């Protein structure tokens, strides 16, 4: 092709990025009829026009018109969507700089009617579309001195989707998209010109000529009622999404208006994303009342509308999600296309629906990272585990249900290994399972008791206790109780319910005295001290010789560290609760979590690696299931994008910002939890940075191990209400971090 030949339909486009790679992506995009609607074309840079400007030259005019008709375009650059803005060429701008209706006295001869202009009729819409993207909303103050209250009131009929601000003298300010403001400006200009003409000319000269069909088709604002012999006609345009929503919410309203006022309403698409409603009636019909009725109903139902799009990770389930949401949100218009849901409705409904999608239907992965390591197995002393086994197996079963994981318990030498693995590939809550198990293990360890049975009073009967048969029988009958036998006493260690049965079994021979043990969590000199007061309550009064022997045992008995379950060495006493541990054991435990493993007393202020962001809340009158007498506290977290630090998994890498919403009942306990959450947020404990299995990407912001209710409904399995124990649980989670 000769270079001087110019393709018939050039088009300028603008993106926020530039360079050869972007040019190639644009060329590939506009050559794809499936992606853009375009066809054979070439793309060249136009940096002299403005940064990021490219010229697309289509071989066929039809390809260009298909691109313009589609309206919105975008390409992927570095796996991120980049919008494409369509800019008309210089010739197109010159053709369309003239107003659509130059004046009220415009003659039919002045109306463009050539074929070329008909072909280029989409270009103004492309301009409008581009402008609407630049100006999401435009606010205009009206000059009330120029127009009557009635003229200004007609604005809502002209543009039903406009938002108005009224004063004592009617509408004073309007707010809407750029196209609506243009319509209002044109209408008021016509009204002003009419009034000027009435003052300058006779009534016979001010009569308005009927608009030609072409003028009517190109006119944005509604025409004035046009009187004919048998019929009068009027129409206006509204945005297509808003009209679809209106028909969805009020399916019979159009028919009702037609019957009530004796009119006919013809509906057709007038331009991309716009709908024309043509009101016609016979002389007996009330056309103006019908228009006003429709405008009032339309504005009432569409004024608070917002529209948002949600892309789903699994496009096959998009239709299923749409059906589920349609059942729950009857006033939300939901459209599905190619795995993307378009939500049109009030902001509250959209927010609630997005939460359902993100937190319920598509489970959000929550992964916790401890400092510089990721837990994948727990090892405990096998002898210690045996003492707690029945209690821990129940807890493991609860953990499996709570976090949708499976567990595996195995012995390796003197150690018992506990492994948790997620059942769901898209959500991994195993770290929560490990944390819950550690808490349960420490709690159960604190319930262990030791009891010393003195054998002296048994005389010869105690010989059978030293036989192998007794030891084998005891271990078989009481596998969860550890016993140590010497010449003077038998020491039993286990949980209280197991210990009572084992003690009864040993004492069947009679005549054997007992010294009741104490719980490990009591704060005396050593965790395993013998409590003589409990001893007296548990058995008949002992003779002096027995008491003196117990005193000797007190002196010989050494403290046991509940972390390693061995004799305490290099003892360290915690200052608040006075519990004692091996110094290396407690130092290591404190490095993971600065709390006492025995009583959960906090030591020091925990600081997390939460990214920068904000936390705000509002109060809604709507109640939560289970808290019908109270309103709802709505918490909004807005976390900023940033760069990971040394505290995060991949220092130096960027992470995107997110917004999350959580709900609490607006009662005394809920407000208490709100204050605690604010403290946790200040200590950077609410969020962390990790890996999202749903998105398939790393380096994103995820929840930390303080659980939130991110849905109003659905119960615990949907992260919602009712959940009677939630507030208690979250306070315990906060307490474990030193926040109470």
Swiss-Prot record:
Bilayer topology term: Peripheral membrane protein
Transmembrane segments: none
Bias (Basic and acidic residues): 206-218
Induction data: Induced by IFNG. Induced by IFNB1.
Effect upon mutating residue 209 to N: In a breast cancer sample; somatic mutation
Pathway annotation: Protein modification; protein ubiquitination
GO CC terms in record: cytoplasm; cytosol; early endosome membrane; lysosomal membrane; lysosome; nucleoplasm; nucleus; protein-containing complex
Record note on quaternary structure: Homodimer and heterodimer. Can heterodimerize with DTX1, enhancing its ubiquitin ligase activity in vitro. Interacts (via N-terminus) with ADP ribosyltransferase PARP9/BAL1 (via PARP catalytic domain) forming a stable complex; the interaction is required to activate PARP9 but is dispensable for DTX3L catalytic activity. Forms a complex with STAT1 and PARP9 independently of IFNB1 or IFNG-mediated STAT1 'Tyr-701' phosphorylation. Found in a complex with PARP9, STAT1 and H2BC9. Found in a complex with E3 ligase ITCH and ESCRT-0 components HGS and STAM. (Microbial infection) Interacts with encephalomyocarditis virus (EMCV) C3 protease; the interaction results in C3 protease 'Lys-48'-linked ubiquitination.
GO BP term, example: positive regulation of receptor catabolic process
Location relative to the cell: Cytoplasm; Nucleus; Early endosome membrane; Lysosome membrane
E.C. designation(s): 2.3.2.27
Name of this chain's protein: E3 ubiquitin-protein ligase DTX3L
């Amino acid at each position: 092709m000769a270079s001087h030949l110019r393709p018939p339909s050039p088009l300028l486009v603008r993106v926020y990025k530039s360079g050869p790679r972007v040019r190639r992506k644009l060329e590939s995009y506009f050559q794809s009829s499936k992606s853009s609607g375009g066809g054979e074309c070439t793309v060249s840079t136009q940096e002299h026009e403005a940064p990021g400007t490219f010229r697309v030259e289509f071989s066929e005019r039809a390809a260009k018109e298909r691109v313009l008709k589609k309206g919105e375009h975008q390409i992927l650059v570095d796996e991120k969507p980049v919008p494409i803005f369509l800019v008309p060429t210089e010739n197109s701008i010159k053709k369309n700089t003239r107003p659509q209706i130059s004046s009220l006295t415009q003659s039919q001869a002045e109306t463009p009617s050539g074929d070329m202009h008909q072909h280029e009729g989409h270009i103004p819409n492309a301009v409008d579309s581009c402008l609407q993207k630049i100006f999401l909303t435009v606010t205009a103050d009206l000059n009330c001195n120029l127009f009557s209250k009635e003229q200004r009131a007609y604005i809502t009929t002209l543009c039903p989707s406009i938002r108005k601000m009224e004063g004592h003298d009617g509408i004073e300010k309007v707010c809407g998209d750029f196209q609506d403001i243009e319509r209002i400006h044109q209408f008021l200009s016509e009204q002003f010109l009419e009034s000027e003409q009435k003052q300058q000319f006779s009534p016979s000269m001010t009569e308005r000529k009927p608009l030609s069909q072409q003028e009517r088709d190109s006119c944005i604002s509604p025409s004035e009622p046009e009187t004919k012999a048998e019929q009068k006609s009027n129409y206006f345009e509204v945005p297509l999404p808003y009209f679809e929503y209106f028909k969805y919410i009020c399916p019979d309203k159009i028919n009702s208006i037609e019957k009530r006022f004796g009119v006919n309403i013809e509906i057709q698409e007038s331009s991309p994303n716009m709908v024309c409603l043509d009101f016609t009636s016979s002389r007996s019909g009330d056309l103006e009342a019908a228009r006003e009725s429709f405008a009032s109903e339309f504005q009432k139902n569409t004024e608070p509308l917002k529209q948002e799009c949600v892309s789903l990770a699994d496009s096959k389930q998009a239709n299923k999600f749409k059906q589920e949401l349609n059942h729950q949100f009857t006033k939300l218009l939901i459209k599905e296309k190619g795995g993307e849901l378009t939500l049109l409705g009030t902001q509250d409904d959209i927010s609630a629906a997005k939460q359902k999608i993100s937190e319920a239907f598509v489970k959000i992965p929550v992964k916790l990272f401890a400092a510089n390591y990721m837990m994948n197995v727990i090892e405990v002393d096998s002898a210690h585990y045996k003492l707690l086994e029945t209690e821990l197996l129940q807890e493991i079963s609860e953990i499996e249900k709570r976090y949708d994981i499976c567990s595996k318990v195995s012995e390796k030498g003197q150690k018992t290994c506990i492994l948790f693995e997620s059942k769901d590939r898209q959500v991994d809550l195993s770290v929560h399972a490990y944390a819950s198990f550690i808490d349960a293990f420490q709690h159960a360890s604190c319930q262990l008791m030791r009891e010393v049975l003195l054998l002296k009073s048994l005389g010869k009967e105690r010989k059978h206790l030293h036989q192998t048969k007794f030891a084998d029988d005891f271990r078989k009958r009481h596998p969860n109780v550890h016993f140590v036998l010497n010449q003077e006493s038998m020491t039993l260690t286990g949980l209280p319910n197991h210990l009572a049965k084992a003690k009864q079994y040993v004492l069947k021979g009679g005549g054997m005295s007992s010294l009741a043990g104490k719980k490990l969590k009591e704060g005396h000199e050593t965790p395993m001290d013998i409590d003589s007061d409990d001893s007296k309550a548990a058995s008949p009064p002992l003779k002096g010789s027995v008491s003196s022997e117990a005193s000797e045992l007190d002196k010989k008995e050494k403290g046991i560290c509940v972390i390693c379950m061995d004799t305490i060495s290099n003892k360290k006493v915690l200052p608040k609760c006075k519990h004692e541990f091996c110094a290396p054991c407690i130092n290591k435990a404190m490095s993971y979590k600065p709390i006492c493993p025995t009583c959960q007393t906090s030591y020091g202020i925990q600081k997390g690696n939460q990214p920068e962001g904000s936390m705000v809340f509002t109060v809604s009158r709507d109640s939560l299931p289970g808290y019908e007498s109270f309103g709802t506290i709505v918490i909004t977290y807005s976390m900023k994008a940033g760069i990971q630090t040394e505290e995060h998994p991949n220092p130096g890498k960027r992470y995107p910002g997110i917004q999350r919403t959580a709900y609490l009942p607006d009662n005394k306990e809920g407000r208490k939890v709100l204050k605690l959450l604010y403290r946790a947020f200040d200590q950077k404990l609410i969020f962390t940075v990790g890996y999202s299995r749903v998105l398939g990407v790393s380096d994103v912001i995820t929840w930390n191990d303080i659980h939130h209710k991110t849905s109003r409904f659905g119960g615990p399995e949907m992260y919602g209400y009712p959940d009677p124990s939630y507030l208690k649980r979250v306070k315990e989670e906060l307490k474990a971090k030193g926040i109470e």
